[in-house]
């Protein structure tokens, strides 16, 4: 079936989104054109502005329109002395939703992966080391993902922290709240046993 070149172009563009295949892209394109053209225009405008105006914070590397993001420029956060290292800006959002962290962040935009040619410079560790040297940092909390690459990245950063006399800690991994032990995989259960805590009354 021969379709409009513009329609084909729209469907192809939509396929750049994660989890969107040919059928999903087709449904989205038809939905926008048939029922929600105003929504499509808003989407196009928002995408154009975001792609041209959103960059990276010069301190933590998260997404922002400013040179320094709102979290990094917050005086209370600066006085806190803690930096939480995460793999992506989405991780910041997840941690902020807990309301349990009052420090600043550093976003790696990935993790170390020598097999893929991703080394320390590719994930901004030079900038992190600069911050360790010049800022008054009391603790670096390593919140990389509990994967082989995430653990290797955390270990590398912990060594960097040790070289600069800064305490490094790793977020706990283990059995999820409300989970049943028989449903938990062996690796997670091993982490839970190794990282057990004394009972507090």
Curated annotation (Swiss-Prot):
It holds the Pfam family RecR_HhH. Signal peptide: none annotated. A zinc finger (C4-type) spans 57-72. One of its GO terms (biological process) is DNA recombination. GO terms for molecular function: DNA binding; zinc ion binding. Keywords: DNA damage, DNA recombination, DNA repair, Metal-binding, Zinc, Zinc-finger. Disulfide bonds: none annotated. It comes from the Bacteria. InterPro entries: DNA_Rcmb_RecR, Rcmb_RecR, Rcmb_RecR_Znf, TOPRIM_dom, TOPRIM_RecR. Residues 81-176 form the Toprim domain. The keyword Nucleotide-binding does not apply. The keyword Membrane does not apply. PROSITE patterns: RECR (PS01300), TOPRIM (PS50880). HAMAP family: RecR (MF_00017). Belongs to the RecR family. May play a role in DNA repair. It seems to be involved in an RecBC-independent recombinational process of DNA repair. It may act with RecF and RecO. This is Recombination protein RecR.
